[in-house]
A protein has these predicted regions:
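Extended intrinsically disordered or low-complexity regions, especially N/C-terminal cytosolic tails and loops
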Residues: 1-204, 216-282
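Acidic/aromatic/glycine-rich contiguous surface patches that form carbohydrate-binding/processing clefts
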Residues: 212
Length: 282
């Protein structure tokens, strides 16, 4: 593993300069604020010429700081969205005369994780296979509450026949996105249409933010832009070029869905964070 002086030497080999921030200050930044791999990762945002990047260390350090603030802000937004959508889904189930809160979960648990592509029809499997899938999916939902192989007493009584209000509370985001899609396909509820389109993109940002992965780096092209997002962006003057960037698509989806499903109080609570972030970008 390179020591801090060797890390700076390596950056110099990449034609990264230390005119704005000198090597002594850069050494301190690498020790206290940003580790080498992550900071160097942002160099890929710049065009490489003659085997080097010819950029200032200060720019990489600033990008890393901005990205950290962006990740913190987006993480809070995705948590707001998750909370608001779980509340909305439970409300819709409660108001649905065809549901009692148990049947929908039982159906969902019987479907394997690839239900959107195969095995959606439980009739194509044996009762034993369906039960195996059900137990596996149920254990997956409650696994982070399982202490030493045993559920807490308050949850244990629900395990055999868990209701929606228990399962949804403890679903991880990926599980909830799958359930949201399942419920929307079953009832085609207009209140969930936009969420069903955007939540897979929101999940991308949540994963990056929660796992400390850069957002404004590795700005790869992606053609999977939902038409809904394109129309929204076009209405507010976002260029087509921006819609070719994967991380931008995911970020825009998060901002749009937050505005769609969260209460005014929650939106206003995040306005200050977004405003400060915008000022920092400038």
């Amino acid at each position: 593993m390179l020591n801090f002086d060797e890390q700076i030497a390596k950056l110099k080999q990449m034609n990264i300069f230390f005119n704005i921030i000198d090597t002594e200050k850069a050494n301190e930044i690498l020790r206290k604020n940003n580790y080498f791999f992550k900071l160097a990762y942002f160099r890929k945002n710049f065009e490489k010429k003659n085997g080097g990047y010819f950029i200032e260390f200060a720019y990489l350090s600033d990008l890393a700081t901005i990205d950290m603030k962006l990740r913190y802000t987006m993480l809070h937004l995705t948590l707001d969205i998750e909370h608001s959508l779980k509340y909305l889904v439970l409300k819709l189930i409660t108001e649905n005369n065809q549901e009692d809160g148990y049947k929908i979960i039982d159906e969902f648990l019987c479907i394997d994780k690839s239900y959107s592509n195969s095995n959606f029809d439980t009739n194509s499997r044996t009762p034993e296979e369906v039960m195996e899938t059900k137990i596996k999916n149920k254990n997956e939902i409650f696994k982070h509450m399982n202490k030493r192989g045993q559920l807490p007493e308050k949850l244990n009584k629900y395990y055999q026949n868990p209701p929606a209000w228990v399962c949804i509370e403890f679903m991880q985001l990926g599980q909830f996105v799958s359930f949201l899609n399942f419920y929307y396909k079953k009832y085609n509820d207009e209140e969930l249409r936009v969420a069903n389109i955007l939540m897979p993109l929101v999940k991308n940002i949540r994963n990056k933010s929660a796992h400390n992965q850069p957002i404004i780096a590795n700005l790869n092209y992606d053609s999977r832009l939902p038409q809904y997002l394109f129309e929204k962006g076009n209405n507010i003057g976002i260029s087509r070029n921006m819609f070719g960037i994967k991380n931008f698509i995911d970020t825009f989806a998060t901002l749009e869905l937050h505005n769609q499903v969260c209460s005014n109080a929650i939106i206003q609570a995040r306005y200050h964070d977004l405003d400060q972030l915008q000022k920092r970008y400038k």
